[in-house]
């Protein structure tokens, strides 16, 4: 016989930042689902082991960024653990940028200075890692400057990229850079008037959408290396 005098337990999960968590969870799901297509494409093109590994670095950095962001915006933890998730979230941005460069430098720019550019990009990524580990609450504009500057290091090889990459790939690459840049500027400015749009959808969520658009464009670029 059931004892109805006992209180019922209710189990629910509370998202810390619903809009941000949901947008990048969608990004995470799409990232995971998109992995096989790019790997199959690379194998079909006869990519070397190094080039396949480079594609894998890009894909893993993409999944890593959206997983870290989803976790940070989902879990409302105590201060110390929340700080760890925040560090991971921000560090993965550097890794995604460097991860995006990796297949481009080792495929399109292989033997054309791509290796040097790749070393420079990963050096900045490791510098960003150190910055985020030891100065978590630095000014947001500083992060944006580093992200955008790192992203546009490719301008040093622009003529080579233009000559070596098929036109559709070049324009997708450029579009991705523009989306990321707009997102980075919005992140730095933190426009308060955008936070009045909806209780759970404001400037940070709009930043997330621009990041997702940038990732989508540069994912397509990988089919034109």
Locations of regions flagged by a protein language model:
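Multi-pass alpha-helical transmembrane bundles in non-GPCR membrane proteins
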Residues: 1-225
């Amino acid at each position: 016989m059931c004892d109805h005098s006992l209180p019922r337990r209710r189990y629910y999960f509370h998202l810390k930042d619903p809009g941000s968590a949901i947008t990048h969870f969608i990004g995470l799901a799409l990232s995971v689902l998109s992995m096989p297509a790019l790997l199959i494409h690379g194998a079909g093109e006869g990519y070397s082991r190094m080039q396949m590994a480079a594609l894998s670095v890009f894909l893993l950095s993409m999944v890593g960024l959206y997983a870290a962001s989803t976790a940070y915006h989902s879990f409302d933890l105590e201060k110390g653990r929340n700080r760890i998730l925040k560090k991971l979230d921000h560090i993965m941005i550097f890794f995604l940028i460097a991860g995006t460069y990796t297949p481009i430098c080792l495929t399109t720019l292989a033997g054309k200075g791509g290796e040097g550019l790749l070393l420079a990009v990963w050096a900045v990524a490791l510098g960003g890692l150190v910055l985020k580990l030891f100065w978590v609450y630095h000014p947001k504009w500083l992060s944006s400057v580093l992200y955008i500057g790192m992203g546009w290091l490719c301008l040093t090889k622009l003529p080579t990229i233009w000559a070596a990459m098929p036109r559709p790939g070049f324009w997708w690459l450029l579009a991705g850079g523009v989306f990321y840049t707009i997102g980075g500027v919005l992140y730095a400015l933190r426009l308060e008037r955008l936070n009045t749009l909806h209780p759970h959808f404001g400037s940070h969520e709009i930043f997330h959408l621009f990041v997702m658009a940038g990732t989508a464009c540069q994912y397509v670029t990988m089919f034109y290396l």
